[in-house]
Amino acid sequence: MLLIPAIDLKDGRCVRLRQGDLDDATVFSEDPAAMASHWLDLGARRLHLVDLNGAVAGKPKNEAPIKAILQAVGDDIPVQIGGGIRDLDTIERYLDAGISYVIIGTAAVKNPGFLQDACGAFPGQIIVGLDARDGKVATDGWSKLTRHDVLDLAKKFEDYGCEAIIYTDIGRDGMLSGVNVDATVRLAQHVRIPVFASGGIAGLSDIEALCAVEDDGVEGAILGRSIYEGALDFQAAQARADELAK
């Protein structure tokens, strides 16, 4: 079970949002690169970056801190990024800069042809972020709920050749209310590619619950508010996940 610290970037700072609301942000660090080094020192095996301003603008908006993060971690661990990725040029620039995986969210739902092209151009490096509430996919920073069924879209995107899916239960994200294991497992059983859980992870019991379904295809989790506010000790959580995998 791969536990991945999230670094959400807004105006050059590391923040956490509640329910995806840009106006409800808690600043956790003025120095995102130092935060990246902190998670690396604690044994993180991958980092998850989100350009929140970019997600709104539809193009990269936190390039300086992203570059600083990549310099801080070097080649030690892979870094994945999402937020505002709408064209192949942006993907290419990120990969050339040292990003390992690019996450496509809203653009994958609105423009499946773009996702298909991206998977073809950059095989093994495209992850899809699917945000859902009650089984329906949301787009545009969660502001719009579509009629798309999350399971149907996941299968379609797998067929396009995406590397993995990050599934966020948007009713729980940033709320520390517990991960939606059932919905995550349903999705993981529906596809053959890895699924990463996101949203609501509050403590060690959530990690243990996800470890119990790792064989169903839930291969990791994105950790946010819980590790920033101290509800979850990252090092202890990864150690426990490794122990349960034996």
Swiss-Prot record:
InterPro entries recorded: Aldolase_TIM, His_biosynth, HisA_bact_arch, Isoase_HisA-like, Isoase_HisA-like_bact, RibuloseP-bd_barrel
GO biological process, one term: L-tryptophan biosynthetic process
Main localization category: cytoplasm
Pathway(s) served: Amino-acid biosynthesis; L-histidine biosynthesis; L-histidine from 5-phospho-alpha-D-ribose 1-diphosphate: step 4/9
Matches recorded under SUPFAM superfamilies: Ribulose-phoshate binding barrel
Single annotated GO MF: 1-(5-phosphoribosyl)-5-[(5-phosphoribosylamino)methylideneamino]imidazole-4-carboxamide isomerase activity
Reactions this protein catalyses: 1-(5-phospho-beta-D-ribosyl)-5-[(5-phospho-beta-D-ribosylamino)methylideneamino]imidazole-4-carboxamide = 5-[(5-phospho-1-deoxy-D-ribulos-1-ylimino)methylamino]-1-(5-phospho-beta-D-ribosyl)imidazole-4-carboxamide
Compartments where located: Cytoplasm
Keywords carried by this UniProt record: Amino-acid biosynthesis, Cytoplasm, Histidine biosynthesis, Isomerase
GO cellular component, one term: cytoplasm
Domain of life: Bacteria
The keyword Glycoprotein is assigned to this record: no
EC number: 5.3.1.16
Name of protein: 1-(5-phosphoribosyl)-5-[(5-phosphoribosylamino)methylideneamino] imidazole-4-carboxamide isomerase
Upper lineage: Bacteria, Pseudomonadati, Pseudomonadota, Betaproteobacteria, Burkholderiales
Active site: D8 (proton acceptor), D131 (proton donor)
Protein family according to the UniProt entry: Belongs to the HisA/HisF family.
CDD domains in the cross-refs: HisA
